[in-house]
């Protein structure tokens, strides 16, 4: 497999819009993904997360905006020419082929670099000559398009344009943007075609056998090479799909809710397995799910998608502990929300009580949303911030989920201890358990 270093940004989405007819499904998506990261696109059904994945994979075209791969816009590059592999929810395996046959399928088109001594000098000279021609043509075409785009953008600044003319100009600008992307990729495309023809060779049968043996061992399918797909469990099918994607050595693996059809135990095992494989190979994984726990466990970073926009993009712990708003907090985990008032630096009022907080970035008197996670609340029988009584007790296997009524407020608490209904208790928390955020349209 490739030795891939985790460092620079490999994929960037810049001001990406996607429209289906009159419906805008993605709105100004900006997203940078580093090489070697496991990034999850998390959101409810219909939020646009799968559309983002399909745009990166080349299965959909952007309406406008850029999709940059290693700094070059590839939005007009077809799926089969992108250095990606996709694992679908239904696995998309070939039922008429065995495990080995499915994995071998992509390898048959693979090319191997020739050794330097196998390539005549005349071939290198020809390549350098053609490369100069391609570069000159690329520069000329890009310059022409820049002039055209500047002209169209100037025309669009006219506030007196009617809707019909504005749309016509915008369509021309969008079209020129796709042509710009095409010419940005012109040199790379021509160079790759030349290299494939003159600088590479077909993979041999012996090399195919070795690569298949190595990948089957990597994904834990040794001994199942000749089994039919219909004989496999869901977890094993997922491993075949993963092996088929990895064996072609893509830079990016796209995973569209690949674990959603598995039962809980197999799903948990596959989560661990996927993360282990990704870390071992150092590949970039872009993973779509609506399962919050799955995203938190697997990801280096999570992009939370809501109504076609990125609500928050950060490391899992940062999103869980410091959500940007109430919606994100509720979506990513269980929450207790209180209306709070910022008193002064490091002091906030919650349920009429002034408490210490680590927050110091707000304005005195500012109304805020206050988040406290259920697992951050402690129960004491003798003392605490607030006194209440247990009105609900649900056993969750590894903990108890309690609802505690404090005056007219219901507070959810997770605890390892059992408490009878109607038990009088006190609740409290550490200073850093208070997470403050601005209220939407809040007034000071």
From Swiss-Prot:
Insert, as annotated region: 111-201
Domain (ABC transporter) ranges: 11-332
Membrane topology: Peripheral membrane protein
Enzyme Commission numbers on file: 7.6.2.11
Keywords: ATP-binding, Cell membrane, Membrane, Nucleotide-binding, Translocase, Transport
Binding site for ATP: 43-50
The keyword ATP-binding is annotated on this UniProt entry: yes
Any single Gene Ontology cellular-component annotation: ATP-binding cassette (ABC) transporter complex
Enzymatic reactions: ATP + H2O + polyamine-[polyamine-binding protein]Side 1 = ADP + phosphate + polyamineSide 2 + [polyamine-binding protein]Side 1
SMART domains xrefs: AAA
Cell compartment(s), UniProt: Cell membrane
Keyword Transferase: no
UniProt main location, coarse: membrane
Family the UniProt entry places it in: Belongs to the ABC transporter superfamily. Spermidine/putrescine importer (TC 3.A.1.11.1) family.
Entry protein name: Spermidine/putrescine import ATP-binding protein PotA
